Amino acid sequence: NEQSGISQTVIVGPWGAQVT
């Protein structure tokens, strides 16, 4: 998602969730 010029990618996998 792009908010205020900041791009965030939420990755959900078997290890859990992380935001990059």
From Swiss-Prot:
Coiled coil: none
Gene Ontology molecular function, alphabetical: carbohydrate binding; IgA binding
Keywords from the UniProt entry: IgA-binding protein, Lectin
Known partners and oligomeric status: Tetramer of four alpha chains associated with two or four beta chains.
Reported function: D-galactose-specific lectin, binds the T-antigen structure Gal-beta1,3-GalNAc (Thomsen-Friedenreich-antigen-specific lectin). Potent and selective stimulant of distinct T- and B-cell functions. Shows a unique ability to specifically recognize IgA-1 from human serum.
Family, similarity comment: Belongs to the jacalin lectin family.
UniProt protein name: Agglutinin beta-4 chain
Source organism per UniProt: Artocarpus integer (Jack fruit)
